[in-house]
Amino acid sequence: MRLSQVGELGLLAELERRGLAQRIEDDAAQLGDGLVVTQDALVEGVHFRFDLVSWRELGFRAAAVNLSDLAASGAEPEALVVTLAVPTETDVEDVLELYAGLNEPGVPIVGGDTTRAELVALSVTALGRSERVPGRGGARPGDLLVVTGPLGASGAAFRENRLARPPLRLVEGRELARHAHALLDISDGLAVDAGHIAARSGVRCVIDLERVPLASGAELDDVGFGEDFELLAAVVDPSGFAEIGRCEAGEGVALLLDGRPYELGGWDHFRRA
């Protein structure tokens, strides 16, 4: 069986089944005493191209996608650890620009590694502390589904041959974490990520697509592209965040447009969902 057949989630399930990794349920791992840790990698030709992004923007993006996982954990960031693989002919000034971007969010870089590679690859580990991590598995029938901002920016940018700048939702994440029953960031597309809440919580997520706020220039199908890095939460009180749906008894995700079923795509690292 190949990765293209099972996808990322299938691989994770097989690792868990064989006892090779603990069950991976949330955006960041909880290590006790409120410490949470997450890691994401960006690989040239897979996640970015230098005709679409500068070295500085790449650095910011690498920090931001990891901080998004901390935001989904209601965490206050404390440190970043950075591993960089680059060709030997890379200009030193380009690497300095990359690190300038990594430093933009204001989280200290406390360690890492640098090594040689044919293409650029960047892996960031982010550490933070959270008083309460809602996770993905606590949503209940009757909960409302809310998002922290407009969706579709990344998909719209891709259609225009560019990359969107990820938002930082750390403040919103800490606010939502105080009372949300489930919380995650939208990195794989709205339908896919709502499906994570539905599967872990044992509920059916019903999303009214006409209520989903769209980013400037975005079309509805862009919401399925992923990499918006807004937060999706299941709550009792929307607290001013955009309400886009609800949780019901049942399973799976129902996407409705004017009351009729609608399909959105989503992202899987080894296949399109």
Set out the residue ranges of the language-model regions.
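Acidic, Ser/Thr/Pro-rich beta/coil linker or hinge segments at domain junctions
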Residues: 3, 7, 33, 166-167, ...
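General beta-strand structural signal in soluble alpha/beta enzymes
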Residues: 23, 36-39, 108-112, 126, ...
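Active-site-proximal betaalpha loop/short-helix elements
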Residues: 89-91, 164-228
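Glycine-rich anion-binding loops of enzyme active sites
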Residues: 42, 76-155
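Extreme N-terminal cap/leader segments of soluble proteins
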Residues: 1-54, 73, 78, 82, ...
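Active-site glycine-rich loop that binds ribose-phosphate moieties when present
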Residues: 124-135, 159-175
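Small-aliphatic-rich amphipathic alpha-helix that forms the alpha element of a beta-alpha
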Residues: 55-79, 96-104, 171, 175, ...
